[in-house]
Amino acid sequence: MDAILNYRPEGSEDYYTLLGCDELSSVEQILAEFKVRALECHPDKHPENSKAVETFQKLQKAKEILSNAESRARYDHWRRSQMSMSFEQWEALADSVKTSMHWAVRSKKDLMLEGSEQTYTNTAQNKERSEQRETKQGDPDSTPEKMMQKESESPEKGISPQNPDSPGLSDWNCGHLHFRWSGDTPSELLRKFRNYEI
């Protein structure tokens, strides 16, 4: 218990910072950063530095954890939970801590750029819209007068809004009627219903 209360996070436990990556980095980016860092601090290049071996081992451990999807998910879960214990302790306690702390985990940070799939669909939709506009602009029948003639020749031509007895008026207008319940005067039936008389 004292170890948890007196825990101070070390910089070497943040594997993303150690490798110079971000939480959203791909495995390829992580491996590329590992290669750069490993070349800088390889023990063979610095035989006089006693910490070179330790640093290189930390880099290898960070690469192994972050390049494996399952261990990376566990590491991200531990990192976002901000638990007062090392990642090794977290792994040793396995499910007991994770079960009781499922609510305390922060969510993954948002992407700064949209996904390529989403961008592609938006671009395709915009192309279709612009093509439709060009077709309408190039169409000689797209003038307002011609459009009115086409509408009058449509199946609803027998229906006129001025003639309420014409067949199909209710069908034609059903999507266009907007009721304002607050402005309507309550009927006797509604009054009885509200007063529990029905």
Swiss-Prot record:
It comes from Rattus norvegicus (Rat). Interacts with HSPA8. Interacts with TPH1. Interacts with TPH2. PANTHER family: DNAJ HOMOLOG SUBFAMILY C MEMBER 12. InterPro entries: DnaJ_domain, J_dom_sf, JDP1-like. The gene is Dnajc12. GO terms for cellular component: cytoplasm. The modification Phosphoserine is found at S160, S166, S182. It is found in: Cytoplasm. Residues 121-183 are annotated as: Disordered. This is DnaJ homolog subfamily C member 12. Pfam families: DnaJ. SMART domains: DnaJ (SM00271). Residues 126-156 have a biased composition (Basic and acidic residues).
